[in-house]
A protein has these predicted regions:
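Conserved N-terminal substructure of TIR/SEFIR domains
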Residues: 1-61, 70, 79-89, 94-96
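Short glycine-rich anion-binding loops that position phosphate/pyrophosphate groups of nucleotides
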Residues: 63-65
Length: 98
């Protein structure tokens, strides 16, 4: 994957889906839950795989994001990988945060 999209589900309609649509239009290969996960998949195993295989993590930071456990898990994983690999892999996008 080129990018792993980390976001809160409450931000899908207002920001995430339009971003994903544009990335798909550009031919970017992304890990995005609605495109990647299938019924019966192990959520944690698939998220871990996406986090490991993605070149970069796009993190949609919002008030919703900051209050979720799964998004914190994803962000922590990306930070750990960035520190371990000594590589700038996190691309933050501030969404509706002043």
């Amino acid at each position: 994957y080129d990018f792993f999209i980390s976001h809160a589900k409450e931000d899908k309609d207002t920001f995430v889906r339009p971003l994903v649509d544009e990335l798909n239009r550009l031919g970017v290969i992304i890990w995005y839950d609605e495109q990647t996960l299938e019924v019966g998949d192990s959520l944690r195993r698939n998220i871990d795989l996406g986090l490991r295989k993605a070149n970069y993590g796009i993190v949609i930071l919002s008030h919703n994001f900051l209050n979720k456990k799964w998004t914190q898990y994803e962000l922590d994983s990306l930070i750990n990988r960035a520190v371990y690999d000594d590589n700038k892999i996190i691309l933050p996008i501030w969404h509706n945060i002043n």
